[in-house]
Each structure stands twice: as C-alpha cells, then as structure tokens.
Design a protein with these regions (language model features):
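Phosphate-binding P-loop
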Residues: 35-44
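SF2 helicase/translocase NTPase motor core
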Residues: 9-30, 35, 55-58, 64-175
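Interdomain "pre-motor" coupling segment immediately N-terminal to P-loop NTPase/helicase cores
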Residues: 1-9
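A generic secondary-structure signal marking the coil-to-beta-strand transition
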Residues: 43, 123-126, 182
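Conserved helicase ATPase motor motifs in RecA-like P-loop NTPase domains
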Residues: 179-186
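Active-site alpha-helix of zinc metalloproteases
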Residues: 44-45, 150
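The conserved Walker
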Residues: 51
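Short hydrophobic/aromatic beta-strand immediately N-terminal to the Walker A/P-loop
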Residues: 45-48, 76
Length: 186
C-alpha cells in the first residue's frame, strides 16, 4: 500500500501529467506549445497555427493538463454553432472530459427544476455557442457570474473590433476575459 501511494504521488508530480492518456497522435510542435502554455500559472494565449496544424488538439491538451492538475476546475468553451457537438465529441473521445452543452433549452430546464438558480453553476465543464451567449443578456450575465477558471474561445478571429465598430460577440468576449483568469483563443 505504501508503494502504491508513493507511485501515485510520483505520477501526480510527473511533468507529462495531463499530456498522456489522450487518444491523439501529436505533432512535435503541439507537445511543445501545450507544455509551454500549461506550465504557466494562469495561461492567457492566442494559439495561431496555420489551418490544419492542430490548434484544437493543442487547446485540448492544455485544458486537460490544467484540469487534471486542479488549475482549471471550471471551464467555459465558446465555439461557433456548427462546432458545438464536434468539440463535445472530441473532448470526450480523445481526453475523456465530459462537458455539458448549454443552450436556451437546457438553461430553461435547469431554471424550471430550481427557481432562481444560475444554470451555469450546475456544471463544471461547459460548452456553448458564442452566438447563444452573445444574443442573450440574461444568459451572458449568468455565465459571467458563474466564476470560471478558464475560457476557451474557438474561431476567435471572428471577434472583430475597431474604433468604429465591433462584432456582435465582441462585448461578451471583452467582459468575460476581464473576469476569467485563464484564456485560450484559437
């Protein structure tokens, strides 16, 4: 038993903890980027590889490592509508991370079950579409109040801002990033 506890402690302190066990074939640059970013106490980065070089895998590796080491217990992933289920499947299939998909219907059900509850406090790992939160001030406020450790934003290049105009989702992004310590933009 003592040997098992010693071995467990060694594994928990391993420099590759969170990078092993994922069902992925990594490219060398992905491991390097994931290791560099995950070693930061509170990562705030823009992952800007070329199309097809695995930004999603890099972000998932970082997320997995931060979650396993307890530095990102509450994670909010914002993605375009068309990618919600793809992210859900990839995170579960490749990293065995079980996220909850949030949309208006799910929020309504959670609020019906317990009046006055913030639905975003019901799950630790949440995926929702950027447009869902950007189109509802109530849901955006609830998400903001939920106290996340890490925000992951896919297709961040769609969040445009200039002195004369901004994309519809940019104010949401700006507000969330001001309050959430960790940030991964893809």
């Amino acid at each position: 038993r003592v040997e098992a506890l010693r071995r467990r402690a060694e594994l928990r302190q391993s420099p590759v903890r969170g990078f092993m066990g994922g069902r992925v074939d990594l490219l060398p640059h992905q491991m390097y980027i994931a290791s560099e970013v995950a070693s930061r106490l509170v990562p705030r980065v823009l992952l800007a590889d070329e199309v097809g070089l695995g930004k999603t895998i890099e972000a998932s590796l970082i997320l997995h490592r931060l979650h396993l080491t307890g530095r990102a217990e509450r994670v909010l992933v914002l993605v375009p509508d068309a990618l919600v289920h793809q992210w859900f499947v990839e995170l579960y299939r490749r990293f065995h991370l079980t996220f909850s998909i949030y949309d208006e219907e799910r929020c309504d059900v959670l609020e019906t079950e317990e009046e006055g509850v913030n639905p975003f406090l019901e799950s630790q790992l949440v995926i929702c579409s950027t447009s869902f939160l950007a189109s509802s001030a109530k849901r955006a406020e609830q998400a903001l109040a939920a106290g996340w450790d890490l925000l992951v934003v896919d297709e961040a290049h769609h969040l445009e801002w200039s002195s004369s105009s901004a994309s519809a989702a940019y104010p949401l992004f700006e507000t969330l990033t001001a309050k959430i310590p960790g940030l991964l933009q893809l």
